[in-house]
Amino acid sequence: MQLNIAMISVHSCPLGKLGGGNTGGMSVYIRELAYELGKRGHLVDVYTRAHEPVHDQIVELGKNARLIHLKAGQEEEIDKLAIYPHLAEFAYELENFRKYNGLHYDLIHSHYWLSGWVGRFIQRVWNVPHITMLHTLGAVKNAIGIGKREPDLRINSEKELAKDCHRIIAPSEREKEYLIHYYNASPELISVIPCGVNLDLFRPLEKEIARSHLSLDGEVVILFVGRIVPLKGIDKLLMAMPYLERGQRLRMIIIGGDEHCQDEMERLKSLSQILQIDDLVTFQGLVKQEKLPYFYSAADLCVVPSYYESFGLVALESLACGTPVVATKVGSMENVIRFGETGYIVIDNAPHRIADKIAKLLSMSKTKKEATSSIRRSVTQFSWSNIAEAAVNEYRTVLNSYFSKV
């Protein structure tokens, strides 16, 4: 049976530049899942806020999948919290669009707490089940205490969503445990479905070709990919560099960051100067997703030094390109990384621990290193085809349960 699915992503456009203030793994998740669901014959409309006046209202994401921009406040990039007063307007525009175009949806799948607010409101109007995925949890961020404190408005909204939505999708068992612990969510209403990786895009390239393409030579390349925010622990990665053998020609490449991340970027650049490693560090800025496989393939390893990840999509992308990973014990890293084979997991992001595992990977002889193709094979079960199948099964389960009670 074909499903008509309304996805809501108010603050983050799935086609936005990755690595910026409002665009990251969630944007990739929504775009890839919508595309794969459309390929399977389901109809998917993704609703997002117009953040530029030049946007086409409707953009095709793929077969049966559309991105629809709705006006809610000024058509410009604004802080996430500043979007909250415009959520009612967004919901009103969404319902107007649906009515005008004669659309019917079987279910709502919202992403992030702002979208969850809209989903709760619209659900009562449409009388269909509301499934949410929060992607990160404000209470967890506050418990960690790194970066800007999340407001009570977000915490309370997430608690309400955990109480009255019809299903919460968590990308990892750890995130499920957080939902239960911090928000008293019912375990029976939480389903764990991991994130996926585009195996057609993220694939191994010849290292020499990738390095030539990026004008890199024989340096040992350590890669970071992600948003430039304190929670990512990039400062800890920089502080790990002095622990490494300086006899090697090291190059650290940091990908990510836009005008919304300037304060953190300047802090990190200043830190690299204090550590006297600024000549070893390249702040690459934003990189288009289609170019990322060149960086992953050119790198000797990728590091995920985060304090918190709900899943850890970057690790999947790196491994799919055949490049090993050193990551903190966050998200689903224990299920993604094969310890000592495709990478290492550290209990926290203490610089000496990160440096130790980087050194271990770099010291492995090529005969002991798992072959690039084997590293890639370790994550093929995370194809978007498999993730979409799991999502559809969950949608059907929720629909059957919802309408059996009506």
Residue ranges of predicted features:
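Glycosyltransferase donor-sugar binding loop
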Residues: 251-269
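Short hydrophobic beta-strand element within catalytic cores of glycosyltransferases
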Residues: 324-327, 337
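N-terminal subdomain of nucleotide-sugar transferases
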Residues: 1-67, 403
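Nucleotide-activated donor-binding/catalytic signature segment of Leloir-type glycosyltransferases, i.e.
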Residues: 265-287
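Carbohydrate-associated surface elements
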Residues: 174, 196
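Aromatic "clamp/platform" in nucleotide-sugar-dependent glycosyltransferases that forms part
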Residues: 307
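Short alpha-helical donor nucleotide-sugar binding micro-motif in glycosyltransferases
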Residues: 286-287, 294-299
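Conserved acidic donor-binding segment of nucleotide-sugar-dependent glycosyltransferases
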Residues: 339-340, 344-351, 360-365
